[in-house]
Design a protein with these regions (language model features):
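Conserved small-residue motifs centered on glycine
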Residues: 4
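Intrinsically disordered, low-complexity segments enriched in serine/proline and basic residues
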Residues: 7, 11, 16-19, 26-29
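Short, contiguous alpha-helical
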Residues: 21-50, 54-56, 64-135, 173-211
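Active-site rim elements
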Residues: 61-67, 145-146
């Protein structure tokens, strides 16, 4: 499965009603009241018929297809963890003392996608999108949010296109002679790691949980 699935501006799943706390009206207080929209598998984010990920379909054949499928699913998961939140919530550093936010993750992964191309595409490495401010500069306004979604989609597509020219996983690319296989595994690892961060960030914002 390719692409990122649902539009970042339209929630994949309509949020359920939650019981808020007096301190933070957007967050669930009792761990037993943590909520998910899933009813078929309560540990999931959404039910299968509303989940754009390839979680119940036939698994792909071949190593490259499997890696691409995992990458696509983790990309979608990141967007799902951001759905239904306003700009302030997306920029909220909800797990102090970390400076991470969901918006910061979108910006960071756009930067990482851009950096990966510098490993193997001939020419000068691409300049950084946000300097050193992918997390620190993640401001809670609509313009920054729209920019981050646009940047991420563009950089993902550019890296996908560049790597599509190298389907042999054993081929070594760039000055460092990195194997395509290593780069593909690293891409999956990067998104998987940050989806774990997104789990905690989202739960601390409004209590919503689920794979």
């Amino acid at each position: 499965m390719a692409g990122t699935g649902a539009s970042p501006t339209e929630p994949v799943v309509k949020p359920l009603e939650t019981r808020a706390t007096q301190e933070d009206p957007g967050r669930v207080s009792n761990p037993l009241q943590r909520w998910t929209a899933a009813s078929v598998y309560p540990d999931m984010w959404a039910d299968p018929d509303q989940d754009p990920r390839n979680s119940e379909g036939v698994s792909p054949d071949g190593e490259l297809a499997t890696l691409l499928d995992y990458l696509a699913n983790y990309r979608i998961t990141l967007l799902m963890k951001c759905e239904g939140l306003d700009a302030e919530q997306l920029a909220r550093r909800s797990v102090p003392p970390s400076s991470m936010s969901l918006l910061g993750l979108l910006r960071h992964l756009a930067e990482v996608e851009r950096d990966w191309r510098g490993w193997f595409v001939p020419g000068e490495p691409p300049t950084r999108l946000y300097g050193d401010g992918d997390f620190e500069g993640a401001a809670g306004d609509r313009a920054h949010v729209d920019e981050a979604y646009s940047d991420l989609a563009r950089e993902q597509a550019a890296t996908d296109a560049a790597l599509a020219e190298h389907p042999n996983l054993s081929e070594r690319l760039g000055a460092q002679k990195i194997a395509v296989r290593e780069l593909m595994v690293h891409r999956v690892e990067e998104y998987a790691r940050h989806c774990g961060h997104a789990d905690l960030l989202r739960e601390c914002i409004d209590g919503r949980v689920g794979q």
